[in-house]
Design a protein with these regions (language model features):
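The feature marks the mature, well-folded catalytic cores of soluble enzymes
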Residues: 1-371
């Protein structure tokens, strides 16, 4: 149910967007090695062994692109808020661990999950991101004060002790084949010690929430979400073709009711497609990325080409250089808005990653009645 004069309201990934948070690149750091992070950085990556503050030049460039993105959204009458960056280049600790620095606040989608009138802070699964919610607290506090129906929730903070991670999971050169075997068996770097999830592993389809089980979200995390969202149906999915299964939004992207693009290298398994096929949803292979490799010092894969931001069921923001993805979405009947963001990818992801919904028009609907 949508409340009158609500500040916070968003039930899915495609209803008309009216209010959004866009991240900032200020002070972003490359985090030092830690158990979950080691498993995400490919052995041949130029990020191996590098950590510390990113250069002022790259930060300024990324911030300029994010500011330009904000201007484009505002010209379309979308209200934009920005996080308040804390000092990321400082040591942090809990009774269980110490970390050399934090990460940043470019990708709010990783941290904040908006479902209806509720904004939920995810547990997070990297130690360097444990305090990342603090960047968004000033905004959430403001929404809470202005909107009497808004709910601010925070999932139980995990300890992230060594028990949360498989020791030496990918510390040696194991090879891609072994990694793929492990992910197919759902054998990931994170254990089932306690509930873990990143908000970017969750896609909202009205009454149904689709959650990726992988490196950053475990089964206990999915169970916690199921208990928390009692009025929703929570479905766990996995993508066996992904050797680094982290965050669903460069793998499986809903565009509008009835249409999803799926990474052709990470196909949804046949048995998990039933929910979509039974309800007349079309899953099409996403277009190939325009690039053969990610930008320098970037965690993400070339498939950020799929990391698009849907503004309404007829309009989508696509990264400017991703011409094949833009062409495909154009042929699928969407108006495509090109956004230059590639030089900000390294700070936390693409157009979907760098945003978090505050308000979309529309109410809670059931898009999968047959199940």
């Amino acid at each position: 149910m949508k409340f009158k004069n609500a500040i916070v309201n968003s039930w899915n990934e495609w209803d008309p967007l009216k209010h959004v948070i866009v991240g900032r690149a200020d002070g972003c750091c490359i985090p030092a090695p830690e158990p979950a992070l080691d498993a995400k950085v490919p052995e041949d990556s130029d990020m191996k062994g590098q950590y510390g503050p990113r250069t002022k030049e790259t930060i300024d460039k990324a911030n300029q692109l994010l500011d330009d993105f904000v201007s484009i959204l505002e010209k379309r009458d979308i209200k934009v808020d920005r996080p308040v960056p804390i000092d990321f280049n400082q040591k942090i600790s809990t009774p269980d661990w110490k970390a050399e620095s934090m990460f940043g606040c470019m990708p709010p989608r990783d941290v904040i999950l908006t479902v209806g009138n509720e904004m939920l802070e995810a547990t997070m699964s990297y130690r360097c991101r444990w305090f990342e919610y603090l960047n968004y607290r000033p905004l959430i506090k403001k929404y809470y004060e202005l909107d009497p129906h808004m709910k601010h929730e925070s999932a139980p903070k995990p300890r992230l002790s060594d028990l949360d991670y498989r020791k030496d999971y990918l510390s040696e050169k194991i090879g891609i084949q072994k990694r793929l075997e492990w992910t197919e068996k759902k054998f990931f770097v994170t254990t089932e010690e306690e509930p873990l999830f990143d908000a970017a592993d969750i896609l909202r389809f009205g009454k149904d929430l689709i959650v990726q089980h992988g490196f950053t979200t475990n089964l206990k995390g999915i169970d916690w979400l199921r208990r928390h969202y009692k009025d929703h149906r929570v479905h766990a999915v996995n993508f066996p073709g992904d050797p680094y299964p982290i965050h669903i939004d460069a793998t499986f992207t809903p565009i509008k009711p009835g249409l999803i693009i799926n990474n052709p290298q990470r196909k949804l398994p046949k048995e998990q497609r039933k929910l979509f096929e039974d309800n007349d949803w079309k899953i099409v292979d996403a277009a190939q990325p325009a690039h053969n490799s990610p930008p320098p010092l970037c965690y993400s894969s070339v498939w950020l080409s799929m990391n698009v931001l849907v503004i309404d069921p007829k309009t989508v923001c696509v990264e400017k250089s991703e011409v094949y993805q833009a062409e495909q979405l154009d042929k699928l009947g969407m108006e495509v808005i090109p956004i230059d963001l590639r030089d900000a990818y390294a700070f936390g992801g693409g157009l979907h990653c760098s945003t978090a919904d505050v308000y979309r028009e529309g109410d809670l609907e059931d898009y999968f009645p047959k199940q």
